Amino acid sequence: MIVTPASIKALMTSWRKDFQGGLEDAPSQYNKIAMVVNSSTRSNTYGWLGKFPTLKEWVGKRTIQQMEAHGYSIANKTFEGTVGISRDDFEDDNLGIYAPIFQEMGRSAAVQPDELIFKLLKDGFTQPCYDGQNFFDKEHPVYPNVDGTGSAVNTSNIVEQDSFSGLPFYLLDCSRAVKPLIFQERRKPELVARTRIDDDHVFMDNEFLFGASTRRAAGYGFWQMAVAVKGDLTLDNLWKGWQLMRSFEGDGGKKLGLKPTHIVVPVGLEKAAEQLLNRELFADGNTTVSNEMKGKLQLVVADYL
């Protein structure tokens, strides 16, 4: 093949189609548990959540003030992946191997939101949310008066089993427009190229560069919508996590009306979760009992947790 702008453009059209196919075919889970925000600036500050009167009433004025005072914001980051294609491969028509590479680039860009969101859950024991405490923490302050005054009572959104060393699972309330996690996108994934014959890289290294680029980020929403269970995936521990979320109150003792809708587990707990959520009956000693959790939760087996 003679390397000309027209021949490169024709190949780019084909490879963009492969890239787009990878984007569209990749499975995703993040939007089940995260609020998706279209970003238009370098970072988003989430004090704007307080502009919704019903939300301010629900979480309390102090919570919104905290978000504003702490400047709780999520800064967008640029992510890119690049592949170099030898000019010799162009000239020798050795290009068939690259179509699946571009398709995989599209797939990688599509699953990255899952990687970001589920990493938030995993890191939630060490990363702070709007109140300055870690997202999963035993000392989230809740105040006795509606205006946020009085001596704060520490509230935990962690259930912890003694001597447990395995993988935790998570209960989330995703029934509302505002969800426990936030995914924001500044620029959707796009395929870009450096293919001018007189580009320095083409001249020096004898290869054209193609890359996928996007700007996005993820962060924490309201900790009240999430409970981490550091314990075996059993019916008893599931009920403990359920009841803990149901007990959450805002400042002044206001009932929040939260209830888990989703259970998120790593792949290592998939079998146990499927059995726990779908079986009609459980063995209890010498008898069987009904499974009262059947059908109560939507299961998310997180590929990137």
Curated annotation (Swiss-Prot):
GO cellular component, one term: viral capsid, major subunit
Sorted UniProt keywords: Capsid protein, Host cytoplasm, Late protein, Viral capsid assembly, Viral release from host cell, Virion
Up-regulation conditions: Expressed in the late phase of the viral replicative cycle. Expression of late genes is activated by the viral late transcription activator C.
Keyword Mitochondrion: no
Oligomeric form and interacting partners: Part of the immature prohead complex. Interaction between the viral portal protein and the viral protease I may give rise to an early 25S initiator complex. The scaffolding protein Z and the capsid protein T should then be added to the initiator complex to yield immature procapsid. Host GroEL and GroES are also essential for the correct assembly of viral capsids.
The protein's role, per its UniProt record: Capsid protein that self-assembles to form an icosahedral capsid, about 54 nm in diameter.
Location within or outside the cell: Virion; Host cytoplasm
Keyword Amino-acid biosynthesis in record: no
Protein name in UniProt: Major capsid protein
Residues that span the membrane, as ranges: none
